[in-house]
Amino acid sequence: MKNGVYYNGQGDFKMETGGVMSELKKKINYTVVCVNEFADRYHLSSKEAFTYLYDYRGIEFLKENYDIEHTLSLAEAVDDLTTICRNNGGRY
């Protein structure tokens, strides 16, 4: 658990106190988790992964498709990010 926040595996991020976060915080935290998962898969730093995902429209994709993407496994979300980025000129 980082910074008192955890992903419950059912599409919700929870605070350590158990309170449900605002929708914006959920989206931000989900994006952070996806960036870190992408970084882990491709052996990048978090900053490198974010820059790559931003440049090749992965971040935009997550923002536009949060309602669907957050219901998938993180592995599936990273697969989707990989596809989006490759379709926009990325190499991963």
Can you say where each PLM-predicted feature lies in the sequence?
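C-terminal alpha-helical interaction appendages
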Residues: 5-92
